[in-house]
Every structure is written in structure tokens, then in C-alpha cells.
Regions:
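Bacterial Sec-dependent signal peptides at the C-terminal "C-region" and cleavage site
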Residues: 3-4, 16-26
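Sec-dependent N-terminal signal peptides
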Residues: 6-12
Length: 241
């Protein structure tokens, strides 16, 4: 009787496995039903498009219109694998100045980089410089100009994770605005299509990095530390370096 019961259980498992193997997964439906949907401006509700090497994080407008509002939550940013920056090493710090002997079981002479919270001062500053450098560079902020959070209503935003497109619809001063944001799959390019009867302008800002450990990596008061040049300016395009 026991052998018969065991045979029935094994047979049932085999039939279940066979049935599952014959049932194809609708991958698109699986992904699409988990698309994030945003209906209000919230500093924790930013969404990102990218290609694995380049990423553009947007707010409820589909662009980076309110970076200050989102800075304490999921901050808005544009980052890449290749965009890095280092502050000048004016004091000529050496990596050896950050090392300290920390014996551990099995490793009596373990040498590790530490922060030196109690000094010496030069070692602490060396450790801080190497902690902060190099760091990823925020490549630029792209957003609508002169919009206030209070002017944005009836937000309906969805990230299509299957296509990699961010679809945003909202009212600005009761005028409808539709924005589609996407990133090129092969090149580090972000694009946005804006449809509206409202007279909207788009601005581009380039921040200087901060080097801090936990902020939105943007300093807007260091204009003397970097510059931006307009190489080409035409009615429908511009080349900025």
C-alpha cells in the first residue's frame, strides 16, 4: 500500500512538471503588470530610464524639473559608466597614509584603509580625499523652467518596463502636458517628446559635484570651478561642451 501511494505521488509530480513545461510564460504580460504607476509628486516616487550603462532619473513631469524637492528622497540625476570626476589632490595625499594595521584571527598583520576619526589630522584628511575620489559625475539636469510643484495636478505617470519608456501626463495650470521619456539602447542618449498647448521651456543645468557621502551630488554655487560652452546654436538644436 505504501509503494502504491508513493507511485501515485511521483506520477502526480511528473504530470505537474510536464504541464508546467508545456505552458509558455507570457513574459511581456508578466513585466507589464508590474509597471510602476505614479499619481502624485513624491520625493520617493522618481523613476529611471536607461540602458545599463547610462541612466536618467525623472520626477513626475517626465524630466528633472524639481531636483530640490526630490533631493532628500530618491534624487534626480543623470549618470553613466564613463562620467567620473576627482577633486585636485593639492596636498599630495598618498594611499599609504590611509592604511592601518588591524590584526584579525588568521591575519595577524591585516592592513586596511580606515577613516582615522581620532587623527592624526593628515591621515584623516587623506582618508577623506580617497573616500571621495574619484566619484561619479552628475552629467546634467534637464527640466521644465519656471514651474512650481503647486502648479502640477492630475498626474498620471507610468514606466513601461517592457519598452523602457516613461509616459507622463499632467496638468500645468489646467493645461494638459504629455511627456514621453526614453533612453537609446545602444548609445548614451536620453530623449523626451513633449506635447502641450502650454508655453513651456526646457532648461539644462550642469552642477559641480560635492564629494559628500550621502547627498544628491550637486553643488550649484561653484560656477568658478567649471564652465560650459555652446559650440553650436540653431533653432532646432544646440551643441554644448
Amino acid at each position: 500500500m505504501r509503494d502504491k501511494t508513493l507511485f501515485i505521488v511521483v506520477l502526480a509530480v511528473m504530470l505537474l512538471v510536464t504541464a508546467c513545461a508545456d505552458t509558455a510564460i507570457d513574459r511581456r504580460a508578466l513585466v507589464m503588470r508590474n509597471n510602476p504607476h505614479v499619481t502624485k509628486i513624491d520625493s520617493l516616487h522618481s523613476l529611471t530610464v536607461g540602458n545599463g550603462r547610462f541612466a536618467f532619473t525623472a520626477d513626475a513631469t517626465g524630466l528633472q524639473t524639481f531636483p530640490e524637492y526630490y533631493k532628500e528622497g530618491l534624487s534626480l540625476g543623470t549618470y553613466s559608466e564613463w562620467g567620473w570626476h576627482s577633486f585636485p589632490n593639492k596636498e599630495d595625499y598618498k594611499i599609504v597614509e590611509t592604511l592601518q594595521d588591524h590584526p584579525l584571527p588568521g591575519h595577524p598583520h591585516g592592513i586596511y584603509a580606515v577613516q582615522f576619526p581620532e587623527g592624526p589630522e593628515r591621515n584623516a584628511k587623506a582618508a577623506e580625499w580617497f573616500r571621495a575620489n574619484p566619484h561619479r559625475l552628475h552629467l546634467g539636469n534637464i527640466g521644465f523652467d519656471s514651474l512650481a510643484v503647486s502648479d502640477i495636478t492630475e498626474i498620471d505617470q507610468t514606466l513601461d518596463m517592457w519598452k523602457g519608456e516613461l509616459h507622463s501626463h499632467f496638468l500645468w495650470r489646467k493645461l494638459p502636458v504629455t511627456v514621453t521619456t526614453s533612453c537609446n539602447g545602444d548609445s548614451d542618449i536620453v530623449s523626451a517628446s513633449v506635447s502641450s498647448s502650454a508655453k513651456l521651456a526646457v532648461g539644462i543645468r550642469f552642477p559641480y559635484p560635492t564629494g559628500e557621502a550621502a547627498d544628491d551630488a550637486t553643488c550649484w554655487t561653484a560656477d568658478d570651478c567649471h564652465s560650459t560652452d555652446i559650440i553650436l546654436s540653431e533653432p532646432q538644436r544646440a551643441l554644448i561642451r
